[in-house]
């Protein structure tokens, strides 16, 4: 995604390579991508809208909350998001407008395992966690037996 971000007109602001190897030279022991920040991309670019499972973030300036919500919801994915605000109530109100399965306000990856987790739109396959797991990981079977 570092290369794609650049191809789409973005600029690597921080990171973008593995610690000891160029991105194309992945050793057999694996490679670890530095935390990467990409700026200057369109909010509709592939790098900005795909679900990247790695330490990559794209930055997008906005004029008001409505524009920020529009940019956040433009993706076809919706696993998780985070909102950072000096005003927790405002952050909570903003979070309600996001199309994601879980939203953290002024925190990240903080979840009670008894609560549901899972994405919306093209993210995930439903809810897991707590009672939701019983339905998600169970398959009901109706067995009818006629006695002797």
Give residue spans per PLM region.
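General beta-strand structural signal in soluble alpha/beta enzymes
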Residues: 12-15, 105-107
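Alpha-helical packing segments of well-folded alpha/beta enzyme cores
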Residues: 1-2
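Conserved C-terminal structural/oligomerization subdomain of aldehyde/semialdehyde dehydrogenase
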Residues: 25-148
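Short, solvent-exposed loop/turn elements at beta->coil junctions and helix N-caps
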Residues: 16-25
């Amino acid at each position: 995604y570092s290369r794609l971000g650049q191809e789409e007109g973005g600029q690597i602001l921080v990171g973008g390579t593995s610690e000891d190897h160029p991105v194309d030279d992945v050793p057999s022991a694996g490679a670890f991508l530095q935390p990467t920040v990409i700026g200057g991309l369109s909010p509709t670019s592939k790098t900005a809208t795909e679900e990247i499972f790695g330490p990559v973030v794209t930055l997008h300036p906005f004029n008001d909350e409505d524009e920020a919500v529009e940019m956040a919801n433009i993706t076809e994915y919706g696993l998780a998001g985070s909102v950072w605000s000096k005003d927790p109530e405002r952050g909570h109100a903003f979070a309600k407008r996001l199309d994601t399965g879980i939203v953290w306000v002024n925190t990240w990856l903080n979840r009670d395992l008894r609560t549901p987790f899972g994405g919306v739109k093209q993210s995930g396959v439903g809810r897991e966690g707590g009672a939701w797991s019983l339905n998600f990981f169970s398959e009901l079977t109706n067995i009818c037996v006629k006695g002797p």
